[in-house]
Amino acid sequence: MDISLTGRSAIVTGGSKGIGFAIATSFASSGGDVAIVARGQESLDDAVKRIRQSAKGKVTGVAADVATAVGVQKAYDGAMAAFGKVDIIVNNAGTSATGPFEKLTDEVMQTDLDLKLFAALRLCRLVWPQMKERKWGRIINILNVGAKAPRANSAPTSVSRAAGMAFTKVLSGEGAPHNVLVNALLVGLIEADQHVQAAKKKGIPLADHIAAMTKDVPLGRIGRAEEFANMACFLASDAGSYITGTAINIDGGRSPVV
């Protein structure tokens, strides 16, 4: 099956590292034009350089903090200046803050909502009219399996992701008559910079950290970012033209719910 994004342009937030970088790379190597958005200019420049090595489409970087309305507007303006249109949105920016409810402050909750939920809402609001007008659009919200099966001590992350899943379903219903397809991809244990940082914080080797995490993964290993990106690329292409309003676990079978 040929997966092509030739002639399509995409915004990938949180696109300089991990899953976002893998998705941007997959899109670009499939012929799409890609604007990657990240806060750090140095990591952004490095990511753009690396993606261009295998890209068939254009690649640009936009330094912006999508946790703010100003930052989202900057990301949108950068993509429009580079490509003149946006066909695909990947709302990937976010962190995985967790902890006991009793220590969850309003500030921590709002920070997580701003980066995960409001960033997606604002970017979709900006791009939505042109997607409807062209009768073609793809929106992919990157959440995690906690959106379906939240565990104790998993707020604020699981709470904001659950809201993101509801947002996905609402948009899918409104977009379907206009061929704007909206889906969510739910992260399980996937290779990412956050695992490297977590291992450093614990003062243990990365391999030991990963081994402990993957004990309850039926496939017995951590997933590769490229494996996650493959599904995103499929959903963004014409090959995924009859899929909307769903949330797909990419977790090696770890989630207790389908």
What kind of feature is each model-predicted range?
Residues 1-3, 19, 149, 233, ...:
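Short C-terminal tail/terminal secondary-structure segment
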Residues 9, 16-18:
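Conserved glycine-rich cofactor-binding loop
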Residues 73, 77, 96-110, 153-156:
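Conserved mid-core segment of classical short-chain dehydrogenase/reductases
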Residues 100-101, 105-113, 139, 209, ...:
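Substrate-binding pocket helix/loop in short-chain dehydrogenase/reductase
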Residues 101-102, 149-155, 177, 220, ...:
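Active-site loop immediately N-terminal to the catalytic Tyr-X3-Lys motif
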Residues 124, 160-161, 168:
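Active-site helix of classical SDR
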Residues 129, 173-177, 241:
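Alpha-helical segment proximal to the catalytic Tyr-Lys
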